[in-house]
UniProtKB/Swiss-Prot annotation:
It catalyses: N(6)-carboxybiotinyl-L-lysyl-[protein] + acetyl-CoA = N(6)-biotinyl-L-lysyl-[protein] + malonyl-CoA. Gene3D superfamilies: 2-enoyl-CoA Hydratase, Chain A, domain 1 (3.90.226.10). Pfam families: ACCA. It is an enzyme of class 2 (transferase). SUPFAM superfamilies: ClpP/crotonase. It comes from Thermodesulfovibrio yellowstonii (strain ATCC 51303 / DSM 11347 / YP87). Keywords: ATP-binding, Cytoplasm, Fatty acid biosynthesis, Fatty acid metabolism, Lipid biosynthesis, Lipid metabolism, Nucleotide-binding, Transferase. This is Acetyl-coenzyme A carboxylase carboxyl transferase subunit alpha.
């Protein structure tokens, strides 16, 4: 059964009506072909109208959609012979992070990515995609292994943030994230990142120091969630609500379109009408095509130059022009 977001209710009603007419037509001699065709045309127009005018908060909702494809879904679409590797060799394994080696069109690649989980049981097992320090250390271990064999690394980012629990802090959550930032900036292999859902704070950044970073059309990437931002800035004597979340999402500039404009990401991968969960196979094919084309170019760049370009890429983020006139 399809899960609909609140702003998708008109679409839901129309899709239900079309399904009812199809069942009625199949079980009788009544020919409803033209009516179904008319409603399908109306449905496409409605979807185009709704999804071409999404607010940042609505995009946030789509990025969190429970049916949205996760890292393991894309692995099954994109990779051949994927072998998952476990453990950080220091503490243990973290199911919130998937890491391993596989092939794309016969060529080897390493992949690391967050995994949220689909069912309640799996979400608890995956900790809702919130990685512990051992998850980030496992990811780095696999990236170092890829460097040893000159294999490009693909990262898939989809997390509300790194897990802030006591155990995670005791095992060095901040150090693990910071170490990933440093080590990834020095890897002598191509790094290609994809924000496929939520890109939340340092938990996302720990897999994002890449030569090229791409976002799906309805993904988000931000220093904090709209809810967290609203609670910090505007919570007084009463709880914050949806209007505050909408305002925060607008102010944070967390959409792929905003981030492309600011030069934070390199490009946007379009999604089918309704979001990636409507046609995951098609989105997987688009990601695969981007991986192959970008990796083909990055592999040609000498390692030292690759590291230099990566450094320059991130040094440019946040640069701005100011007035030379200073107040005395």
């Amino acid at each position: 059964m399809t899960y609909y977001l609140d702003f998708e209710k008109p679409i839901q009603e129309l899709e239900i009506k079309i399904e009812e007419l199809k069942k009625l037509s199949d079980g009788s001699d009544i020919d409803l072909t033209q009516e179904i065709k008319r409603l399908n045309k109306k449905l496409k127009e409605l979807k185009t109208e709704v999804f071409s005018n999404l607010t940042p908060w609505q995009k946030t909702q789509i990025a969190r959609h429970p049916e949205r494809p996760y890292t393991l879904d894309y692995i099954s679409i994109i990779f051949e012979d994927f072998i998952e590797l476990h453990g950080d060799r220091r503490f243990g394994d973290d199911p919130a992070v998937i890491a391993g080696i596989g092939k794309i069109d016969g060529d080897p690649y390493a992949l690391v990515g967050h995994q949220k989980g689909r069912t309640i049981k799996e979400r608890i097992y995956r900790n809702f995609g919130q990685a512990h320090p051992e998850g980030y250390r496992k990811a780095l271990r696999v990236m170092k292994l890829a460097e040893k064999f000159s294999i490009p690394v693909i990262t898939m980012i989809d997390t509300p943030g790194a897990f802030p629990g006591i155990g995670a802090e005791e095992r060095g959550q901040a150090e693990a994230i910071a170490n990933n930032l440093m080590e990834m900036s020095l890897l002598k292999i191509p790094l290609i990142g994809f924000v496929i859902g939520e890109g939340g704070s340092g938990g996302a950044l720990a897999l994002s120091v890449c030569d090229k970073i791409f976002m799906l059309e309805h993904a988000i990437y931000s220093v904090i969630s709209p809810e967290g931002c609203a609670a910090i800035l505007w919570k007084k004597n009463s709880d914050v609500g949806v209007e505050d979340y909408m305002r925060a999402a607008e102010e944070l500039k967390l959409t792929a379109q905003d981030l492309k404009k600011f030069g934070i990401i390199d490009d946007i991968i379009s999604e089918p009408l309704g979001g990636a969960h409507r046609e995951p196979q098609e989105v997987g094919k688009r990601i695969k095509a981007k991986i192959v084309s970008v990796a083909t170019e990055l592999i040609k760049i000498p390692p030292d130059e690759l590291i230099k370009k990566r450094y320059e890429k991130f040094r440019k983020i946040g640069n701005f022009w100011g007035s030379s006139n200073r107040r005395k």
